[in-house]
From Swiss-Prot:
The gene is coaA. InterPro entries: P-loop_NTPase, PanK, PRK/URK. It comes from the Bacteria. ATP binds at G91, S92, V93, A94, V95, G96, K97, S98. It catalyses: (R)-pantothenate + ATP = (R)-4'-phosphopantothenate + ADP + H(+). Pfam families: PRK (PF00485). It is an enzyme of class 2 (transferase). It is found in: Cytoplasm. Its EC number is 2.7.1.33. This is Pantothenate kinase. Keywords: ATP-binding, Coenzyme A biosynthesis, Cytoplasm, Kinase, Nucleotide-binding, Transferase. GO terms for molecular function: ATP binding; pantothenate kinase activity.
Length: 306
């Protein structure tokens, strides 16, 4: 184990799955398919072996958060205020963050039927393309400087204080923020925050997004595997874009397969790999839990912070 993981306990898949009594998966195969991202791969067995124990662990942290909040209120002689439980999920582009986030949202909704479980992606806090063009940052989209971190931190602060909060909405079809559209959040019991940058903050070194998280997950994999997944996903997106001339990716949909692969590989190496190595992976040890994926997308190792 490298020094980076010295503060983590390594748990094999075989050991991890014993931490939850065998039970039904709480969702159907059709539901699982509907929340699985393009070219991701997850099975009902993965839900039972990996995600049901994870739901149990999140419940442990939730109870601890409530107990601490209760004790603080007694100490300060203030009324007890239960705050939203915020879960941050990070990792590279194409590593499977969205699938994990949607699955956790569904499972938490099933295990906490009286709770409001919401999901927000940090894509909505990217600056609009026009602003990025004006600032000469369009080719840096996804890098730390392309996010409105002040707006994102204000959003999390409002959520944590039980206030109604609004998040911009991003569309991958148009590759931009949707004008005049907001997603509203009214004091949810759980909020899942998903994005490549959830452990970063380049604006203010004294405050990190992760300061607002009650639990956090990093989805990890070898960069060569992620590159393969990224290219496979890009090709799948192009197939879908052929049916929609208004889709941002329609301009690439007519490329010969070899050229499309070369284009995707170049984007991976010049943008996504650089972003991963310089800004995303270095934040990995800020997570409470690291889920490591093998080449077939299956989670084979789990690292839990000691």
């Amino acid at each position: 184990m490298s020094n980076e993981f010295i503060n983590f306990e390594k748990i094999s898949r075989e050991s991890w799955k014993t931490l939850h009594q065998k039970a039904k998966a709480l969702l159907t195969q059709e539901e699982l398919k509907s929340i699985t991202s393009l070219n991701d791969n997850i099975s009902i067995n993965d839900v039972i072996d990996i995600y049901l124990p994870l739901i149990n662990l999140i419940q442990v942290y939730k109870i601890a958060q409530e107990n601490l909040s209760f004790s603080k209120s007694l100490f300060l002689k203030k009324d007890i205020q239960l705050r939203p439980f915020i879960i941050g999920i990070s990792g590279s582009v194409a590593v499977g963050k969205s699938t994990t986030s949607r699955l956790l949202q569904l499972l938490l909704s099933r295990t906490h039927p009286n709770s409001q479980v919401e999901l927000v992606t940090t894509d909505g806090f990217l600056y609009p393309n026009q602003f990025l063009i004006e600032q000469g940052l369009l080719n840096r989209k996804g890098f730390p400087e392309s996010y409105n971190m002040e707006l994102l931190l204000d959003f999390l602060d409002s959520i944590k204080n039980g206030q109604t909060a609004f998040a911009p909405v991003y569309s991958h079809d148009i590759y931009d923020i949707i004008p005049n559209q907001k997603q509203s959040f009214n004091n949810p019991d759980f909020l899942i925050v998903e994005g490549i940058n959830v452990f970063q903050n380049q604006q203010n070194n004294r405050l990190y997004m992760s300061d607002y998280f009650d639990f956090s997950i990093y989805i990890d994999a070898d960069s060569s595997h992620i590159e393969t997944w990224y290219i496979e996903r890009f090709l799948s997106i192009l197939k879908l874009a052929k049916r929609d001339p208004h889709n941002y990716y329609a301009q690439y949909a007519q490329l010969p397969r070899s050229e499309a692969i070369a284009f995707a590989r170049n984007v991976w190496k010049t943008v996504n790999l650089e972003n991963l190595e310089k800004f995303i992976e270095p934040t990995r040890n800020r997570a409470e839990l690291i889920l490591h994926k093998s080449a077939d997308h299956k989670i084979d190792e789990i690292y839990l912070k000691k």
